[in-house]
Structure formats: C-alpha cells, structure tokens
Amino acid sequence: MEQKRTGLSYVFTLAKEERGKLSLGMLLAVFSSALSFVPYLVVYQILLLIIKQEVTLPAMLGWAGIGIAAAVLQAILTSFAGICSHTAAFNTMHRIKVRVLEHMSKFNLGFFQEHAPGQIKTTLFDDVDRIETFLAHSTLELAQAIVVPLMMFIFMLRLNWIMALIMLVPMILGIAIPMALMGRYPDLTDEFAGDTEKLNASANEFITAMPVIKMYHLTAEKFEQYRNSLKIYTDCWIKMCESSCNPLSIALVVLDSAILFTLPVGGWLYLRDSLSAASYLLFILLTMCFFTSFLNMVTIAMQSMELGSGLDNVKKIMDMETMKSGQQTLSKTGCYGIDFDNVTFNYTQGGKDALSDVDIHLEPGSLNAFVGPSGAGKTTAVQLLGRYWDVSSGTIKIGGVPVTELQTENLSDLTAFVFQDVFLLEDTLLENIRMGTDATEEQVRQAAKAAQIDDFIMSLPKGYATRIGDEGVKLSGGQQQRISIARAILKDAPIVIFDEATSYSDIENEHKIQLALQNLLKGKTTIMIAHRLHTIRNADNIVVFQDGKVVEQGTHDELIASGSTYSHMWDTYTRETIGEE
C-alpha cells in the first residue's frame, strides 16, 4: 500500500510555538497585498472624474496622495511581515534541529551504524532548511494568494457579476489543466529526495576514502560509483523539470491570457450599456493584477510537493521509537560481573541470528577475552552490552541487573569503550582526552602517561594545547588508539571494553600498553577483543565465538589442553607469527 504523504499541517505542527508570529506575519502580508489594490481604485476614481469632466487639482492631488500613502504603508507592512515570518522560520528551524538531535540521542547506537552520515545530514540540514524557506516565504505568499484574489473577486462581483464570473473561467482552467498533467511529479519529489541522500553518501565515501582509493588504484572504479550516483540524481532532476514544465507553462499561458476573456465580454457589455467605460478599464487592470496574485498559488502548490518528501523524512525520524531507559542505577565505584543469559540477536526480523543462545558469566574484576574469526559475533556481543541494540531474546546483566532496567546515563557511566575506529574532535589533545568531563589537566596527564602517549604529547611545541584536525597535528593510527585508551582510563568506569585495542600498535608500544593495562585495570571487569592471541594469554577467561555461538571458554592453558577450536587458532596464529618473523 502506498505510504501517505505528510501534509502541510505537519509544518505548522512543527512551528506551533511560532504560530503567533506566523499569524501576524500572514495578517500583515494580507493587509499589504490589499493595499496593492488601492492604485487600481485610484485609477478608477480618476477615470470617473475624467469621464464626468469633474477634474480639479485638489481632487487629483487627493487621489494621488492616497495612492502614495498606500504604497508607503504597503512597503512598511511588507517589511514587518517579512520580519515576523523570518523570525518564526529561523526559530522553528533551530527548534526542529535541536529536537531531532535530542530525539536521535535517545536511539540505540546501532541506528548510526545502519544509517549513512549523508542520509542523516540530508534530513537534518537540507530537509529542515526547506521547511525554514517555506515558513519564511511561502506562508506569506500563500496568505496573499488566497485572500487578495478573493477580495478582488468580491469587489468585481459588486461591480459587475457577469464580468466577475467570466474571470473564473481562466482561473479554473489554470488550475485544472496543470493538476491533471502533473502526473508523477509528487512521486518524483520522493525519488529525488532519496537520490539526494545517496549522492551525499557517495560523495562522502569518495572523499573520506581517498587515501585508500589512491593506494589501491581504485580511483576510476570509485569515481565511477560517484558519477553513477550523480547521473541518477541528474536524471531524476531532469524528469522533475520535464514533469512540471508543461503544466506550469500551460498555467502561465492560460492565466496570462485571461484578458482575452475579459476584453470581448467587457466590450459586449459596454456596447449594451451594461458596463461603464471606467469599469471596463478597471476590469482590464484588475485582470492582470488578479491572476498575477493567483499564479503564486500554483507555485506554492509545486513547492509543497517538493517539501512533502522532506517532511516525510523529518517525521519518520521523530516517529522512531527511542531506547527505553530503565529506572535502576549502580554505583560507578562498584565492581560488577557480567552475565549473558541465553542471548539471541539478529539485525533484521526474520534474518539470520548474529548471536544464538549465548551464555557467558564474567566474574567481577576479571580480565576476559572474546576471540574468534571475523563475523563470529564477538563485537556484536559487546555492542549489545552497551545497548547499541537490544537483544531479540534472553538477558544481559551487569551486577545482576538487566541492562534494559538501568538508566541509560548510568549504563554509559558504567562502561568505557575503546573502539577500533577512533573518533577525534577538531579540538586540543587535552579536550580530546577529557571529552567533556571535569578532569583537571594533571588527571588528564596521568591517564595519558598510563596510555603511553604523554611523552609524545609533551614533545609537541604546544603540548596538550595542540589542536587535532585540518589546522593541527595529524596522529598515526597507534597514537589515535592510545588517545582512546587514555579516555577510557580517565573515565574510570568499572567495566572496560577494548575492541581490537592494540591492532594499530607496534610491538614496543603494544608491550607498554599491555603493562599499563595490567596495572590500571585491576578491580575492573574487562573485555578485550583481539586477533593477536598472545596479548590475551593472561586473561582470566577466554570466550571463543564461532558462527554466532560460544563454542568454548576457559583460561588459555585450559583451552590449549582441550585441543579444540582455540587450540587450533593458537597453533595457526603462532605459525603465522613465526613465519612473519
């Protein structure tokens, strides 16, 4: 079944706090447009004076003064209307972006792995900016397009009802024909929004991956992918233009030729003495003014169709279910065990299980290792511990409390992750380690020393005040990893998870990090994920994953003695290590 498009009413729902300013702006715009009608009345009155041969200087100056005053007042009202609508639009844009970000901050972290940054960026900026543009400009034009033609039509009815009804003919044709010919335009706006997201994602990937692309001579292949995305985007844009060009052209022709309806009918009425010469000329002037205002309604209809896909994207995010926070809390100074009780998880409903019937018990303060081939489920297991996603069935507990029953802030305080891919802010090294905490510079330095990165930082001219990023220092993969470890040490959470924590470290630094971790992680429940099996020989418990299941667990010596999966992994690893040496 076709999904129902989000209506314009949702725009005003999003802008409900600004309805007062928007209403005032629209009201001022209506008065301003009504004043644009005054010059035509002035011309009409002057024509009457000329026809009646009652022209006097005071009368002419009086009507001229009225016309000038109306023009000045119209300019003032238009200015204030724009101030009201733009203020409301910018406030609404700010409020929507804050609300969307706040809402997204309550999602499971898996949402950000499932959605490309380009897709999120399109919704947060492009779609919301279109809403701002609509509120700032189209709301005023909409009020003018409805009220001004209506006022003119009522005036023309009082002047001559036959001429007024004749004016409806081009108006009806100008609406009906374009709407009938619009065809796939509404669907194309949805398609265009999707193509825009894909183009942003493709461009982001192409630029971000440029070093790897050049290293492996993939420039032509990856550029071809980007060019294909650009071609799809361009083709859709051309289809939209083709779909709207003919209807809009017909609307313009019909509405601009409205005078062809009023001229002959007005002439016929004049010859029959049913219409005065002054009224006849006034109708000719009003015809041009009437349909210029009315044409805005056709333009706004097109804009609303384009706005619809953006509204759909915003509403889709705002309607997404957030991660439910529990009510219980655990002290950050405690020491807790971790239990996976019959945990099963799949990324898509009905899809293959990424984890199946996983049972693990990790003792408080123990050093644990999750090992296994890529895709075995070890990273998924620790992500479920941090509630990147919630389990499909079973329970994960910290200190006997299910993670779903813990307050989300408390769960974050209890766990510290060292990710394989390190994200660094374009800020100083001090702030990158501090990460929003109130730690002193000395505490940051102690954490950096423990992570074996203090010597490098102090060797820089600005030390901890050195900035990272385009305008600052560039860090190697191993240095970035140690910054991440320093963050985890500074956080001092009772549970620490290292995902491929030493994958970027050379032998010397890896040894230093291992020594530091042995001293600093005492009393903490630690999970390490590593392919370098020699780094976890001293682990209290090694959990072996294969195809989403736990196939064995125990100490290094116990697993070697069993001669099973881990033993074969160890033999393969040692042979490869000796071969490399």
Each model region followed by its residue ranges:
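Helix-loop-helix
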Residues: 49-65, 155-169, 243-312, 317-318
